[in-house]
Design a protein with these regions (language model features):
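C-terminal secondary-structure termini that scaffold catalytic or DNA-interacting sites
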Residues: 81, 92-106, 113-115, 133-135, ...
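Catalytic-site neighborhood detector that most strongly recognizes the C-terminal catalytic loop/helix
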Residues: 26, 34, 90, 116, ...
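Key DNA-contacting residues within the recognition helix of helix-turn-helix
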Residues: 2, 70, 177, 190, ...
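Well-ordered beta-strand positions in beta-sheet-rich domains
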Residues: 34, 83, 106-110, 202
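Basic, Lys/Arg- and aromatic-enriched nucleic-acid-binding interface segment
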Residues: 10-72, 80, 91, 104-105
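Short, basic (Lys/Arg/His-rich) helix/loop patches that form interaction surfaces
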Residues: 41-52, 62, 109, 124-130, ...
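Proline-centered turn/helix-capping motifs that create local helix->coil transitions or kinks
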Residues: 9-17, 79-81, 120-127, 157-158, ...
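Non-catalytic DNA-binding core/recognition domains of DNA-processing enzymes
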Residues: 1-8, 111, 148
Length: 234
């Protein structure tokens, strides 16, 4: 609209540009978050038997992007050195496998002790996909969404309503905050997350969720870290 008025003014079709003083509204991007302890408990429980359980645990314990898990083969799961080698990802909007956008996307992630037995249990042929579709093809956005939605439905059946903002990327975010809580340096976290810019890692390291804030204030008011706790006065 602004461009249209600008051209009309330049062509002297209108005496002035009515859009010149307009300001565009600020758009606030949705903020990814870590999972709550209640969500973690439910996720770990359902992962024990759900068909997408290994995929969910891999997202949670490696911080990999969903597109990176789609490209993962058993040759990338290095049981000898207890590492997962990340060097490829599914191209957005297709099933094509490509290299990472930046060199930082290539990385080795140690296998979490809780993830190792599940990987060993599902171990396949070296160059077969770790998370194929039922047809044996590379996952795309639609198939991964179906896996996620199926998992969420079971969470709701067992634990009640699930927050609308709980997405696979919340598990990646949680991996990073778990590193921060464990005292892992931000530089190491950047490497494990595959971030090209350390500021991206810093934004997660410095972002405190509501649960963390309530726990910290509990040291002062004796509320136990829960909203609505008893506040000591005086």
């Amino acid at each position: 609209l602004q461009e249209m008025f600008k051209r009309a003014r330049q062509s002297r079709l209108i005496p002035y540009d009515p859009a010149e003083l307009l300001s565009l509204p600020t758009v606030t991007k949705g903020r990814r978050r870590s999972i709550t302890e209640e969500e973690r408990t439910a996720i770990l429980r359902i992962s024990q038997h759900h068909r997408a359980g290994l995929w969910i645990l891999t997202l949670l314990y490696t911080g990999m992007r969903p597109g990176e898990t789609a490209a993962l083969t058993w040759a990338d799961v290095d049981f000898e050195h207890n590492e997962i080698h990340v060097h490829a990802a599914k191209e957005s909007g297709s099933r094509t496998i490509k290299g990472p956008k930046t060199a930082s996307g290539v990385r080795d992630i140690p296998i979490h002790a809780a993830l190792l037995p599940r990987l060993l249990e599902s171990r396949g042929k070296p160059f077969s996909l770790v998370f194929p579709t039922k047809a044996g093809t590379v996952q795309n956005e639609s198939s991964m969404r179906r896996m996620w939605n199926s998992f969420i439905r079971e969470m709701e059946e067992e634990s009640g309503p699930v927050a609308d903002d709980l997405t696979p990327y919340c598990l990646r975010h949680t991996f990073c905050t778990d590193l921060q809580r464990a005292g892992v340096s931000i530089n190491v976290a950047k490497e494990l997350m595959g971030h090209a810019d350390i500021q991206t890692t810093a934004n997660i390291y410095t972002h405190k969720d509501s649960e963390t804030l309530h726990k910290s204030i509990a040291l002062l008011d004796g509320s136990g870290g829960k909203p609505g706790g008893n506040v000591k006065v005086g």
